[in-house]
């Protein structure tokens, strides 16, 4: 991603003066996610990076959240399946689904199979804007909502609510900057 993002900093002054985005679309290039998903190597690198950034959060969730009253989980925008994998490894009674776009599903299934969890974790294809969410006792969204405006956030949260049973749980994982920037490594 450095190769793609670094050149945009050259237009920082223009961005500050105009308030307009200084990204690839400015000069007729593809939007970020479109460019990533068009190249399997870039997609694998992106999924690996996103999984690495969130591993600590996913491990903490799997160990700290009380899953004892739940049996199923669906991770919306599940990427390489990491959240579902961590929850399944730490909660043997849980079955998990990792829900993401079709190009991601085979990569997630490779990760799941490599860890011997394909009996309890599956990757399923779908588009969280176009499709209803799969039903589950717990719906998770890791680093999803921050990418979208209020209207889309409300739509995604409504879809999650509709996929949950009474007593279900929606868990949103986002990196929030600590105003003091002393107690949050991501905020530094």
Segments from the language model and where they lie:
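Conserved Class I S-adenosyl-L-methionine-dependent methyltransferase catalytic core
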Residues: 1-71
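Alpha-helical subdomain
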Residues: 67-68, 72-188
